[in-house]
Swiss-Prot record:
Boundaries of every Ubiquitin-like domain copy: 1-17
Signal peptide range: none
Modified residues (N6,N6,N6-trimethyllysine): K39
InterPro entries from the UniProt entry: Ribosomal_eL40_dom, Ribosomal_eL40_sf, Ribosomal_zn-bd
Positions bearing the site annotation: Essential for function: H9
Domain of life: Eukaryota
Entry keywords, A to Z: Cytoplasm, Isopeptide bond, Methylation, Nucleus, Ribonucleoprotein, Ribosomal protein, Ubl conjugation
Protein name, per record: Ubiquitin-ribosomal protein eL40 fusion protein
Gene Ontology biological process terms, A to Z: translation
Name of the gene encoding the protein in the UniProt record: UBA52
More details: Ubiquitin is encoded by 4 different genes. Uba52 and Rps27a genes code for a single copy of ubiquitin fused to the ribosomal proteins eL40 and eS31, respectively. UBB and UBC genes code for a polyubiquitin precursor with exact head to tail repeats, the number of repeats differ between species and strains.
Length: 69
């Protein structure tokens, strides 16, 4: 039964099964809505002003993470 369900899940994925909008938004929040440090490439929260890493001297040289096409 588990194998049957996993196969069904895989088939839906391969056919381009839709992701529920709320789950998609949640995934985007955790993976895409980030700021990136230009010196050390650390992933930071979207409202970050300075980097949290010591190795780049807590620089304020940040950019938004590029969006997936």
């Amino acid at each position: 039964n588990i194998q049957k369900e996993s196969t069904l899940h895989l088939v839906l994925r391969l056919r381009g099964g839709i992701i529920e909008p709320s789950l998609r938004q949640l995934a985007q929040k955790y993976n895409c809505d980030k700021m990136i440090c230009r010196k050390c490439y650390a992933r930071l929260h979207p409202r970050a002003v300075n980097c949290r890493k010591k190795k780049c001297g807590h620089t304020n040289n940040l950019r938004p993470k590029k969006k997936v096409k």
